[in-house]
Design a protein with these regions (language model features):
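Short, mixed-charge amphipathic alpha-helical segments
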Residues: 157-158, 164
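C-terminal/peripheral segments of proteins
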Residues: 1-141, 149-152, 162, 168-362
Length: 362
């Protein structure tokens, strides 16, 4: 826990130093001044661990409707009643949310056509499962049509004095339904396009989004594609990568997105954090960090860590899934008691000789 004086001094500091503010907004880092006792942790007699925050000073969110979280701060865990006023150690508020958080709210609130609720306005077990596994991507929903329009207006782009024809790319994206199902054609091309941007571009106005963030409308802002040449250059780079590796632009996602376990591959549907999807499936990345590992080091992994060109996540064995929607459970309180359904996507056993090594993965 921090004192009010320490928090106020920290707020003054980050308002004067953009680097410190950026570290907080993007990494969750609260940089304190070690030279002053003011910034030392406070001990409270009612906390079992010295220096921690008393329970009554922590965010506690209750709702008659729902609460949720998608690896963001507490601010929009109940989007009907945004919560503020707690220590900055619990994360930023009134700032842009991840595209995945925004998609979850779209699904829960039935926004912009993403309505899976019944006539009663509530979710049955089947309806919530349908919402989770719909596999629609919000970034595609928000940006793809404008990208296709820009592509059709300028179907040729120069890269290193080589003309790249984007006509087939335009058609592939136009015909894609913005989903990340195993059979989805266009998902791979869009992924190779959007992952050429910094992940933070999916949250903030700038390289991807033209519209400004509005804290009064955090679920629907920012929006609108930033129209610039970079969009088509990134698309041409994605086309070149796939062409150079003999991968059709309309390859079904399931042909590439796999879980590799002891010599057997399993097709996995779902999308990554750039794509704004409830069913998160994370592949190894070209850079280690919170988004995944740069390689898989496991005795049961039978894929390849060889990166294809400059792709963020594509290897010679496809998109190697390492984590994401791993334990999924739905629970319904019925007149006969709780009724639950659950799945562990990586299966229960790590022993390849066990019958439970890959049964749930399959």
């Amino acid at each position: 826990a921090l004192s009010d004086d320490a928090i106020n001094a920290w707020r003054d500091r980050i308002n004067k130093a953009p680097q410190l503010k950026n570290m907080y907004l993007t990494k969750g880092l609260v940089i304190l001044d070690e030279s002053t006792k003011r910034d030392e942790w406070l001990d409270h007699p009612d906390t079992p661990i010295p220096g921690t925050t008393p329970f009554e000073e922590r965010p506690l969110i209750e709702s008659d409707f729902y609460v949720f979280n998608a690896n963001d701060s507490y601010w929009l865990s109940d989007p009907k009643k945004p919560t503020i006023g707690y220590s900055p150690l619990y994360g930023p508020t009134e700032t842009p949310r991840s595209i995945r958080t925004r998609m979850n709210i779209h699904l829960l609130e039935g926004l912009d056509g993403f309505d899976f609720r019944g006539e009663d306005g509530l979710f049955s077990v089947q309806e919530i499962k349908d919402a989770l596994m719909d596999n629609s991507g919000l970034t595609a929903h928000l940006l793809k049509d404008e990208l296709v329009d820009q592509c059709q207006q300028s179907p040729n782009i120069l890269i290193n004095d080589i003309s790249i024809d984007l006509s087939n790319a335009c058609s592939t994206l136009r015909d894609w339904d913005n989903r990340y199902n195993a059979e989805s054609k266009g998902a791979v091309l869009f992924r190779e396009w959007i992952t050429r941007y910094n992940y933070l571009s999916t949250m903030y106005t700038g390289d991807l989004f033209a519209g400004s963030f509005d804290k009064e409308n955090p679920t629907t802002t920012p929006l609108g594609l930033a129209r610039n040449e970079r969009n088509l250059i990134a698309l041409a780079e994605a086309v070149t990568l796939l062409d150079d590796n003999g991968i059709p632009l309309d390859v079904p996602l399931g042909n590439l997105q796999k879980a590799h376990r002891a010599g057997t591959t399993y097709t996995v549907h779902g999308g990554n954090r750039y794509e704004g999807i409830a069913n998160l499936q994370v592949a190894t990345t070209s850079q280690s960090g919170s988004s995944g590992r740069s390689y898989i080091d496991s005795s049961i992994f039978s894929g390849s860590n060889e990166r294809l060109g400059d792709s963020e996540t594509l290897t010679s064995s496809g998109y190697n899934i390492v984590h994401g929607s791993s334990f999924i459970m739905t629970l319904n309180f019925t007149e006969d008691g709780p009724s639950a359904e659950a799945i562990l996507s990586y299966s229960q056993s790590g022993s390849s000789s066990s019958e439970h090594f890959s049964d749930q993965t399959e």
